[in-house]
Amino acid sequence: MAFAYKTVLMIGCTAGIGLALAERMIEDGSFVIGVGRRKERLDAYVAKHGSDRAAASQFDITDLDSIRDWAEDIIKTYPSLDCVVLNSGIQRSLNFAKPAEIDLPLVQQEITTNYTSYISLIKHLLPHLQARAPEPAAIVTVSSGLALVPIPRCANYCATKAALHSLAWSMRAQLAHDEASKHVRVVEIIPPAVQTELHELQDDLRAKGDTRFGMTIGDFVEDAWAGLARGDVEIPVGPVKARFEALEKARREQFDGVVSRMLGEGQPYSSGSK
């Protein structure tokens, strides 16, 4: 099964996973609209790939009050939009053993960037995807292996990714059991640590000289793309695969039982996953 989507909105496209995925989708023939805050990087992205294969929209998704108008403009400009990738994210260290050092505005910024903004984006973009029926459409979330097993250093980040992982399960079940929405697939990519600027931007990690760790971006994209091309709805990548298989089977069985009781018989939440 090939990647089915031809007009993709990539949230968080100026670096790292988002940029690498966007470029792989362009290579496969998709038109990808990159979204981010850094105009110079967005301009470079379009210049590299050409306006016939790429476009850009400078936007800060944490500006929640502006998302509705921005989403309406995106839909008007790109009516063929059939896939939204929710990828942007930030990570900060958080130590509850030193509560006086906790910066609550930074904590809230992390929650807004990694989770709350996605709710608003889905609310305002999903109606367009629903209206495309029966043509296929997709919402792709990029969570983290830390959604499955957290690490103490970045407790809030892990919590936001766990929330996103849970959201994907419930949203997938809801859409699969709704006649007007069942053509909209909910796909979750679950990365391990990847060598991106996510770690390089953290002062405490830079101070330790501990920013270059994890899977290379090239290896990550190759593995993630294989899952997207297969049509998987859950795509654990690299070392996350073993953790995913060890932890999620029992939870999946329990969740499918809940879905059957509450939403009636139909596709299980994991329908289409490998």
Where in the sequence are the language-model features?
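Conserved glycine-rich cofactor-binding loop
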Residues: 12-15
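Conserved glycine-rich Rossmann-like NAD(P)H-binding loop of the short-chain dehydrogenase/reductase
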Residues: 28-44
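Rossmann-fold cofactor-recognition segment
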Residues: 49-65
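Conserved mid-core segment of classical short-chain dehydrogenase/reductases
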Residues: 68, 75-76, 90-108, 131-133, ...
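Active-site helix of classical SDR
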Residues: 122, 160
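Residue(s) in the substrate-gating loop at a strand-loop-helix junction
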Residues: 144
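SDR active-site lid
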Residues: 173-239
